[in-house]
Amino acid sequence: MKIDWAYLRKGWKSCQNAQAVLDEKHVGIKTTVDARKQRIDADAAWELLQSAASITTAKGKKVQTFNPESDAKADILKQAMGPTGNLRAPALRIKDSFVIGFNKELYEKDF
């Protein structure tokens, strides 16, 4: 499996955990964006997310899956955005789906 796009923040615990699982499973990343250098606000995040077939968000043990065609933009962005108003890291795009946040069980199952 190859991840098309990854939004990662170096030194961030959840990003380190995500990278460790991906490395363990030999999952490559085509393009990596440094979240410390390139901020993605709500409008830019929606531009990325609105065309996805599915968006899975993870906050701790809570995992939710959204469909941008049928679920409310506000509900999706509430889960996808961090407290600073930028897209949460890690955020991964695999084909036409996004995974935002880190949950070990989710990563073990999906990758």
Region locations from a protein language model:
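Local sequence-structure signature of Cys/Sec-based thiol-disulfide redox active-site neighborhoods
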Residues: 1-35
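Thiol/selenol-based redox catalytic cores and closely related redox-interacting motifs
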Residues: 37-111
